[in-house]
Amino acid sequence: MEQPTTKRCIVSTCGTSILTNQGHEIRKLIIDYAHVKDKTDIGENDRKELENLIKTIKNSLQEEGSIENLKKMSAEINGITLLYDNHFPNSGDTHYLIATDTWLGTEAASLLKDWLRGREVNDVQLVAIDDLGASSLAEFQLGIAGLIGWCSQTLPGWRENQYTITFQLNGGFKSIQGLMQTLAQFYSDETVYIFESGNELLHIPRLPVKLDLEEVVLKH
């Protein structure tokens, strides 16, 4: 595959699909502990089962060389590889993985980070936003403010350095995807989703919108 000449900064929302795709029984366990921040708050037996699952998936990601099989393991990997026309990522791009600050959310994103680095993508950063995985609306709103603050502090510099900023929103929780879709109009050049066929990406360009987003957030 010919490497693209455009420098890209790719921001991917990350959920727990890489964990829940392992079967119905483990999915229930993950849902039960989705909002837990400290793994020591989980009973020993359940915690060990989840830790073993994470180790197994990490090994599978390292050993699996088929893109089609990798895409089935994770919505995030599916979206990222489709962004590269069903090839492995370009090693010269920058990737931010937006995750919740829960234990399972951070572990799932760490698996993706390790996979990307294993594909020689060196500039990969996991961004765990405080309270973005909160179970209460009041706490989640604090997470929203934190995510907006991160975008405003981090992403404009990439555009100034002539990078194309892509929001890759195929993974992550629906509430976070909806928020990121709004933020994309201010901080990204395009947003990508998997089309209904499951084999193509829908590219949504940034609209020419100007608004003091931080001021709006403070008012609400």
Residue ranges and their predicted role:
Residues 1-164, 178-220:
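Long, low-complexity, Lys/Arg-enriched
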Residues 170-171:
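Glycine-rich beta-strand-to-loop/alpha-helix junction loops that act as flexible
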